[in-house]
Each structure stands twice: as C-alpha cells, then as structure tokens.
Amino acid sequence: MRIIFWGTPEYSISSLDIFIKSKHEVIAVVSQPDKKRSRGKKLISSPVKSFAEQESIKIYTPEKIRDNINFINELKSLSCDLFIVIAYGKILPKEILEIPKFGCWNAHASLLPRWRGAAPIQWSLMKGDEFTGVGIMKMNEGLDTGDLLLEEKIKIDNNDNLITLTEKLSILSAKLFLNATSLLEENINKNTNYQLTKQNTLGREITYARMIEKSDYKVDWGNEAIKISRKIKALYPRANTTFRGKNLKIIKIKVLSSDEINNEKYCLMSNYSKPGIILAVLENEGIIISTKTDPIILLEAKLEGKNISSKKQLIQQLKPSLGEYLSN
C-alpha cells in the first residue's frame, strides 16, 4: 500500500519505522514545522522529520493544513491508499480526510471513548486506571470520535510512569497499525469489504483528556497520598513543589502504609494533620512528608540547578528541619 505518514514527536517514530521496514511504501511524511526550542532560538526539527530525513523520505511541514489548496493538491497528486496518523498535533479537516483511497487511520493511546483528547496517557495514570491500551480508528472530523477498527488492552503496572507507559504504547501502536493494514489487505484480496469492521464500544464511559497545563505540575500536599503518587508518575519527571523558595522536582516517592506508620523507626514523626510538613528526616529512609492522608517518603528528587538525587543525597543537599513546609 502507498502510505502517507503523519506524526511529530518521538512517540510516533515506532510506527513510522515499522512501516518503512514493511512491504508497504511510505511515499511521504507530514510533520509539524520546525520550532524555536532552545535559548539561542535555533530552529529545531520534530523527531519524526529528523527520522524521515535519515530515511530519505519526502517531507511536508505545512504551517497550516486547513484551506491550504497547494498542499491539498500536492497530497492528491501522490495517489495515496492510506493516511497513517499518530500524534501529528492537529485535527485533519474533511478535505484532507477524503483524499486517501481507504481513509485515514489514527492510533490513540487509550481505550476509547475513555480519554479522548490530547493527553490520554497522563490522565490514565493520574486517575489510577488499571488498564489502558491502543485503538486504531478511522478518522472523522471530530476529536477521537471515529469508528474503532482494532484495539488491544494492556495492564498498567504499579511501577509505570509517563516515560515507561508511553514507550509501551508507542510500540503497541506500531504493531496494531501493521495488523490493521494486513487485515485490510486480506479483505481487499477477497473482494469482500474494503473496510475493517467497526468495533462495539457501547456502554463505555466517555471522558476527555485535556492538555496538561503548567499549574498541573504543582504537587498539592493537601491531596490524598495516592493521588499525589499518581500525579508524580503521570507527569514524570516534571511534577514539582517549592522548598525554601527553590523549585524541587519530585521524581519518586513511596506512600507509607498503616503498618509502616506504626513502626518504631517512624516514631520521630509529629502530628501529620497539616499537609506538606516535614515529619521526619531519617538517614536510611529519607525525608518524610505529610499529606491529607498517609505520609510519603521522598525517594528521588531534583533541586533546581542540581542533578536527580537519591534520598540520602537529598538530605545532604536540603538539610531539612522537622516542621518545615513544602509549598504548592
């Protein structure tokens, strides 16, 4: 099949790579334009554009795609069978969706219609979902509202964070894309149906994964410990707090269980009814901080201007005192 691939971040590369190595022909790649991302205002290409350049594939980086007549005519001239779209960054308008012979397919990193939108991986972790997955859908003009064609569910491990889960779903997306194109080819060869069968999603809850905002990265110590833990995993490694006026990125924590709280080694802890207070500083355990519910131990963090530090290094760097506060 003649394929045009649409994608922008590193997350998309697994899918592009698998199609390049397949029997299909990737005739062009569409990605977001170069952006100024460094202090020197140097223009930086998207990861997908850089990868496509290495593979000597024709690349388009239009500033706009809606009502872009020249770009649309160029796409039409390529006689494409299928558009493969993963994390491109813009919703494709009707005039583009109608170009390829067999439609436009998108891989979405959730169990649709749960977590439609821009940040499904973050919100599945933030809300403590037990499972997530990838769905291949035939795109329409809506926000992740197209027909679901193929889906695979995976369990979210307790140790998963944004980085690890993103990698798993990126690889799964590539596999499902290839499976879906194989199924489509089987149908075409049988002359039975030039489309895949729509999957049934009736009864599933519809939720929306809005974009992550700057304020979301702040740790609210007045929240339940489990919610704080989920946020740190979901926004890894950027969830942060403030200590003595300096930014402190929270990389990894442990929520103390009831049995651990009652253990003798934590007897230095004061009343932890006030959230965000340092309850204890234990050399072999770490810095213990109160929340709305159970206390947490700070296992890894990054003070501004420093590298990521272990619990013992943090004690040496911060020299925290009992009763000090961490602010939102």
From Swiss-Prot:
It catalyses: L-methionyl-tRNA(fMet) + (6R)-10-formyltetrahydrofolate = N-formyl-L-methionyl-tRNA(fMet) + (6S)-5,6,7,8-tetrahydrofolate + H(+). It holds the Pfam family Formyl_trans_C. (6S)-5,6,7,8-tetrahydrofolate binds at residues 110-113. Attaches a formyl group to the free amino group of methionyl-tRNA(fMet). The formyl group appears to play a dual role in the initiator identity of N-formylmethionyl-tRNA by promoting its recognition by IF2 and preventing the misappropriation of this tRNA by the elongation apparatus. Disulfide bonds: none annotated. Keywords: Protein biosynthesis, Transferase. Its EC number is 2.1.2.9. The lineage of its organism: Bacteria, Bacillati, Cyanobacteriota, Cyanophyceae, Synechococcales. One of its GO terms (molecular function) is methionyl-tRNA formyltransferase activity. HAMAP family: Formyl_trans. It comes from the Bacteria. It is an enzyme of class 2 (transferase). This is Methionyl-tRNA formyltransferase. One of its GO terms (cellular component) is cytosol. Belongs to the Fmt family.
